[in-house]
Amino acid sequence: MPKPSVGINGFGRIGRLVLRAAVEKDSVNVVAVNDPFISIDYMVYLFQYDSTHGRFKGTVAHEGDYLLVAKEGKSQHKIKVYNSRDPAEIQWGASGADYVVESTGVFTTIEKANAHLKGGAKKVIISAPSADAPMFVVGVNHEKYDHANDHIISNASCTTNCLAPLAKVINDNFGIIEGLMTTVHAVTATQKTVDGPSGKLWRDGRGAGQNIIPASTGAAKAVGKVIPELNGKLTGMAFRVPTPDVSVVDLTARLEKPASLDDIKKVIKAAADGPMKGILAYTEDQVVSTDFVSDTNSSIFDAGASISLNPHFVKLVSWYDNEFGYSNRVVDLISYIATKA
């Protein structure tokens, strides 16, 4: 089977890291990129140099209106570059892009993302939560994808991708009565470097580098969409903290069946070594956030940081590289849906 041909709309943090993940995994072929705000020579620079994940360990250049990305031992990607503001005008079909990653953060509904289909794309994967597109978390509910009807789908959020695999393992083994999630979350591009206006969410406009900022997140409620039996049982919030990358989920849950912390560790380790390998990982090391920069897993359970009050009430801690782990799942989701074409 030929590799799926992919287009990327929006060459920001996620767009660029999806391309890095595509090069590394060598499982999809990126054939087009669109970004109205970045010239092709600037794309080369932004892709080559990354303050968080380091310099790209390969070659990147441009020839005419094509980006040329290569890495030793991997396939070369010859990528047509577009600079269109209107997604309906991007000629995805002409460049052969069947699957479009919508990573601008702007076109996150079925109606808005549908514009990509007009340019010849067959499927759109939104790299953000969506109000109405079906959400899939690889390793949790990706097998519910329906090729005949699901043309615009969401890869959910980075936090949902961390929480859902953990919640699935716990719920499958012990049952979750209810739970509260907190994510201690790295800064993202929407935050301000210094205090500034921020619409209705005044706290969000405070300086990202000097504050711990309480914020809302739909990530926990979204788990109820990908694991229907947990619908209405989870909610959560976020603290934005002054670190550039890597976040951590704290899930505090009440369990139906009694379980010791050792019982919980055993089932998570079994899932991490077995059916969820590459999605969920397990560590007993004395780790901190920077140890997970560029980690490709969705969720890394921290056995040493997790605690139990009693056999029915536990606090479970799981790390995630909110940029790179997530970008790898975008590529995995495309690889999976391509097998259903």
From Swiss-Prot:
Assembly and binders: Homotetramer.
Binding site for NAD(+): 13-14, 35, 85, 322
InterPro entries tied to this protein: GlycerAld/Erythrose_P_DH (IPR020831), GlycerAld_3-P_DH_AS (IPR020830), GlycerAld_3-P_DH_cat (IPR020829), GlycerAld_3-P_DH_NAD(P)-bd (IPR020828), Glyceraldehyde-3-P_DH_1 (IPR006424), NAD(P)-bd_dom_sf (IPR036291)
Family: Belongs to the glyceraldehyde-3-phosphate dehydrogenase family.
Gene Ontology cellular component list: cytosol
Pathway: Carbohydrate degradation; glycolysis; pyruvate from D-glyceraldehyde 3-phosphate: step 1/5
Top class in the EC scheme: oxidoreductase
Gene designation per UniProt: gpd-2
Gene3D superfamilies: Dihydrodipicolinate Reductase, domain 2 (3.30.360.10), NAD(P)-binding Rossmann-like Domain (3.40.50.720)
Biological source species: Caenorhabditis elegans
Site feature (Activates thiol group during catalysis) residues: 185
A GO molecular-function annotation: glyceraldehyde-3-phosphate dehydrogenase (NAD+) (phosphorylating) activity
Catalytic activity: D-glyceraldehyde 3-phosphate + phosphate + NAD(+) = (2R)-3-phospho-glyceroyl phosphate + NADH + H(+)
Keyword terms, alphabetized: Cytoplasm, Glycolysis, NAD, Oxidoreductase
Other information: There are four nearly identical glyceraldehyde 3-phosphate dehydrogenases in Caenorhabditis elegans.
Family annotation (NCBIfam families): GAPDH-I
Active site residues of this protein: 158
Pfam families per UniProt: Gp_dh_C, Gp_dh_N
Name of the protein in question: Glyceraldehyde-3-phosphate dehydrogenase 2
CDD domains assigned to the protein according to its UniProt record, in alphabetical order: GAPDH_I_C, GAPDH_I_N
EC number: 1.2.1.12
Biological process according to GO: glucose metabolic process; glycolytic process
Localisation per UniProt entry: Cytoplasm
